[in-house]
Amino acid sequence: MFCLLGLRLLKYITFRTAYATIFAFLLALIFGPFIILRLKKLKLDQILRKDGPKRHLSEKIGIPTMGGILIFFCVLVSLFFWIDFWNIYFLIILFVMVSFACLGFMDDLLKIKRKNSDGLNPRFKIYGQILFSCISVTMLYYFGDEHVSIIYFPFFKSLKLDLGVLYIPFGMFILISASNSFNLTDGLDGLAIGLSIVVTGALVIIAYLASRVDFAFYLNIPNIKGAEELVVFLGALLGGSFGFLWFNAYPAKIMMGDTGSLSIGAVLGMTALILKSEILFAILAGVFVVETLSVIIQVVVYKHTKKRVFKMAPLHHHFEELGWSEMQVVIRFWIIGLIFAIIALSTLKIR
């Protein structure tokens, strides 16, 4: 679209990113109330875990889910005006976003239909994630930058590892892990989307640096040709996420649902793959990693000892059970997420 207009100003990444962000945010504010009302009329309410915190059963009844629809609608409409639709990285990201959102939508729909928190068959769900991640990572491997199969390590200037074709299963692991960890973290009002905003904001900075030859050379990071459109995409995602947080902040008027969490996690995971920030992403998304580990530890230990390490998993519910209010958990986790992001960004200079 910006090429057709032929305006010099629209060739600047910073300008397009800024207005993609603003457009997506304003669209969310305008259409948010309408979408929330529509979801309520369709009775698409959040189905709560019966084994979750007891107070959630009374506080969160009747809140519509599938809020990911609001985010992605705003992102895509905004991008229509500001992005080069034929950029290969955008096409890959678009496939990831739509495919994982559809998988999450099916999961949400089945939960509502069955009126319990059991959605898609876990086997079917993981098969779907494997299929979509395999397609997208294979596309990246064959059509991506010359650095595509190389893993770069934070803190070390010249330490890197070329995985060759093994990068495909490695990338699939990153994508599926990111998708599921974001999904696990989406348990409190504003928690997952707030942390996603922190991660997205950091990736905007990394994408901008990687898209510039001068900055990439100075920081000794790969220069990714075409990454400038990722900056615009992430800007739109940032705006849509801020707009969603407007309605998802405590007390929430809408929940993200698997429609949003599975897809946003996968999208940010794919962005990390494109930007050659796979290891850095583990630091950047540190809260999500810890949340996932808490579930794994809880399940493994209980299976072998019948004892629980945490009062409840994921970790945010453990702190609720310790007496923290929902807002205390959310804001403190945001602060920790911001610290992880600062550490991750600082490694770019440490190299």
From Swiss-Prot:
E.C. numbers: 2.7.8.13
GO MF terms held by the record:
metal ion binding; phospho-N-acetylmuramoyl-pentapeptide-transferase activity; UDP-N-acetylmuramoyl-L-alanyl-D-glutamyl-meso-2,6-diaminopimelyl-D-alanyl-D-alanine:undecaprenyl-phosphate transferase activity
Q: Which domain of life is it from?
A: Bacteria
Which reactions appear under catalytic activity for this entry? UDP-N-acetyl-alpha-D-muramoyl-L-alanyl-gamma-D-glutamyl-meso-2,6-diaminopimeloyl-D-alanyl-D-alanine + di-trans,octa-cis-undecaprenyl phosphate = di-trans,octa-cis-undecaprenyl diphospho-N-acetyl-alpha-D-muramoyl-L-alanyl-D-glutamyl-meso-2,6-diaminopimeloyl-D-alanyl-D-alanine + UMP
Please give the CDD domains that the UniProt record associates with this protein.
Answer: GT_MraY
Give the main localization category. membrane
**What's one GO BP annotation on this UniProt entry?**
cell wall organization
Report membrane topology.
Multi-pass membrane protein
Compartments, as annotated in UniProt: Cell inner membrane
Transmembrane residue ranges: 17-37, 63-83, 85-105, 124-144, 158-178, 190-210, 230-250, 254-274, 279-299, 328-348
What does the protein in this record do? Catalyzes the initial step of the lipid cycle reactions in the biosynthesis of the cell wall peptidoglycan: transfers peptidoglycan precursor phospho-MurNAc-pentapeptide from UDP-MurNAc-pentapeptide onto the lipid carrier undecaprenyl phosphate, yielding undecaprenyl-pyrophosphoryl-MurNAc-pentapeptide, known as lipid I.
Q: Which HAMAP family match?
A: MraY
Family per similarity comment: Belongs to the glycosyltransferase 4 family. MraY subfamily.
Name of this chain's protein: Phospho-N-acetylmuramoyl-pentapeptide-transferase
